[in-house]
Design a protein with these regions (language model features):
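N-terminal amphipathic/basic membrane-interacting segments and domains
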Residues: 1-231
């Protein structure tokens, strides 16, 4: 059974701590309601070892699924699940992934996000890749997935439910696994990254880079914070 928590890299990024290297004058630390934009990008996804032997005449290429789950407390972006498939992936290959996975821009009435959780996972298939669009349709019609989405929508509104949110996101593996077909139980790499607004402070302006890597795969995340009044 697929377990996305195998080969797991996890980190909580506190913007209160990150703000320590941002020079400010006393009293000018602004609350989260003052930021004007936030973007999270995923890029540089590298397969270092595809765990497929090269035995003549077989070239040792792998078939891979790439799963992305983003959960936030933004009203119209509470949960976003995406799946992509990649054929004939060799050792050292870069997957064609360089995209924005979360974007928020200030409007007059919209609440600033206080937490964004990202889970990405690289999963090797043991059979021909299935139709990704059909898989996604089946997952979103799955009663367990609907129940999960409902609970996440409820918990994300309460900062005290942080651990429950983390646990719920982890359970997505059992839901996704039953729709992917025959895949390896252990992903190449799963990355769980939380970006949180601790004490209402998003004070690290500009771009912050994050990197996760093990012996099988590597990938990068970046988060960009904008504030027109401080730039």
């Amino acid at each position: 059974m697929l377990n996305l928590l195998q080969n797991l890299y996890t980190e909580e990024h506190s913007f209160k701590e990150a703000a320590l290297d941002f020079t400010t004058k006393e009293g000018d630390i602004l609350g989260s309601d003052k930021i004007s934009g936030l973007e999270i990008r995923l890029s540089h996804v590298i397969i270092k070892d595809n765990k497929t032997a090269k035995i003549f005449p077989f070239p040792g290429l792998a078939k891979i699924y790439f799963l992305t789950l983003v959960v936030s407390d933004v009203e119209n972006q509470i949960i976003n699940l995406e799946l992509k498939g990649f054929e004939k992936v060799d050792d050292g290959d870069a997957l064609s992934i360089d995209k924005t996975i979360f974007y928020w821009k200030q409007t007059k009435k919209e609440k600033v996000p206080s937490q964004v959780h990202v889970m990405t996972s690289i999963i090797k298939s043991k059979q021909s890749l299935r139709d990704v669009a059909k898989i996604m349709e089946n997952i979103k019609n799955d009663s367990d997935y609907k129940d999960l989405a409902g609970k996440l929508a409820e918990f994300i509104k309460d900062a005290n439910q942080f651990s429950n949110i983390t646990n719920l996101i982890g359970t997505v593996s059992s839901i996704v696994g039953k729709h992917l077909g025959k895949v390896e139980d252990k992903p190449f790499l799963t990355w769980y990254q939380s970006f949180t607004d601790i004490d209402g402070d998003w004070d690290k302006l500009g771009k912050t880079y994050k990197h996760a890597e093990n012996k099988y795969a590597a990938m990068d995340l970046s988060i960009t914070i904008r504030d027109k009044k401080r730039e």
